[in-house]
Regions:
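Extended, charged catalytic domains and RNA/DNA-binding interfaces, predominantly
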Residues: 1-266
Length: 266
């Protein structure tokens, strides 16, 4: 994390940055080290400075298997660095991400793998240490207020509304930024923002949204859809003057190849 601070200050010359590691993979030790490192980053040569402003945060990394269950990822960023104004613990997302890291009976590298690849043995050993540390943290009771939970347990929220509620129970009002909403590895096709605009999902707490990243972009709302119909039996949308669905374009490419091979359109 010190490298990230130095890069922000001396290389990229950005005005501010935030650490937002995945909450599902965090532990009490990592969270404390994160807070300590960010506080140290706010100092230069032993004096507090504002040449670059670092923020403490975490990522709520929700993955749903269907569009109805998928809410996506949220970066949670806190304005202040004082202990009382930070979450007692990162709050992870229930479901796929938590189950994969914490509840999966597999996941550890068998010792034989490190032996067979002896030059990289330390990497395998470090991975197993990482997984074991995560899984050794007990899950917080779900029926207690977030403010009353121990700082050494793992807390998770199933929905954006639940996430906001738990933060409010600690009297916290951080910046929450939805991001990574493009279809692909963790976002089921036909997913949309519709269900997240309902009042119980607390959309008023998410005042800005990521519009571009390495995952893709979500810069503007458009009324058309890539696919229509049931997810198990999807139908490609027809093109419009403003939009050519990728599935339709794929069909055009296949058709052209068939015609070049002398096949008929039928």
């Amino acid at each position: 994390m010190a490298d990230a601070c130095d890069y922000a200050r001396y290389c990229s010359s950005i005005d501010f940055w935030a650490i937002t590691d995945h909450a599902e993979a965090s532990t009490p030790r990592k969270w404390q080290e994160t807070k300590d490192s960010i506080r140290q980053c706010s100092f230069k040569n032993g004096k507090e400075t504002n040449d670059v402003i670092p923020f403490v945060g975490f990522e709520w990394t929700q993955v749903g298997p269907t569009p109805e269950e998928h809410y996506g990822h949220k970066n949670v960023i806190f304005k202040d660095l004082e202990e009382s104004k930070l979450s007692k613990r990162p709050i992870g997302a229930g479901g796929t991400a938590t189950n994969a890291l914490r509840n999966n009976t597999g996941g550890l590298m068998p010792p034989i793998v490190g032996i067979l690849d002896i030059l990289n043995f330390q990497d395998y050993s470090d991975f197993n240490y990482f997984i074991n540390e995560v899984r050794d943290i007990p899950t917080c009771p779900k029926n207690k207020s977030s403010a009353d939970l121990s700082s050494d347990c793992y807390e998770f929220a199933d929905t954006p509304g639940d996430l906001v509620r738990r933060l409010e129970e600690q009297n916290l009002d951080p910046l929450i930024i939805p991001h990574g909403s493009t279809w692909g590895f963790y976002t089921p096709p036909s997913s949309s923002w519709d269900k997240q605009l309902k009042s119980d999902m607390r959309p008023e707490k998410m005042k800005i949204i990521e519009v571009m990243s390495g995952h893709g972009n979500a810069e503007e709302f458009r009324s058309y859809q890539q696919i229509i119909g049931d997810l198990n039996n999807p139908v490609c949308s027809k093109p419009t003057s403003e939009f050519l669905p990728s599935c339709w374009r794929a069909g055009q490419i296949i058709e052209n190849r068939c015609l070049q091979e002398g096949l008929s359109k039928d």
